[in-house]
């Protein structure tokens, strides 16, 4: 499969820098556009419970999520790819995660997740 070039919206890095500097942001949801060539910030969340965080994750659509765990001050990069996602879409998100991780300095942990149960102990 041919590798696609993924463009990263600058707001992805800007929001990450805010999260690192202890602004009110606790998580950043990144999504690819319909052409799978642009990664952008879908939404940011702050001051929410873990249950609300888990409920905000789409059960049938992939996302790249940056989550700040304030209890130990770790920043976790989560590649959420539900089991039902087509291989071509999973491949696009894999390329996007590689591209964005090159720009994000300060990620402490990386998780590949296919089942929300894996996130229940964040």
UniProtKB/Swiss-Prot annotation:
Does the UniProt entry include the keyword Cytoplasm? yes
Output a single Gene Ontology CC term carried by this record. Answer: cytoplasm
Primary localization? cytoplasm
Q: Pfam families under this entry?
A: Cofilin_ADF
Entry-linked PROSITE patterns: ADF_H
Gene Ontology molecular function terms on file = actin filament binding
Q: Which Gene3D superfamilies match?
A: Severin
One example of a Gene Ontology biological process annotation: actin filament severing
Q: Which family does it belong to?
A: Belongs to the actin-binding proteins ADF family.
Record function comment: Controls actin polymerization and depolymerization.
What protein does this entry describe?
Answer: Cofilin-5
The taxonomy runs:
Eukaryota, Amoebozoa, Evosea, Eumycetozoa, Dictyostelia
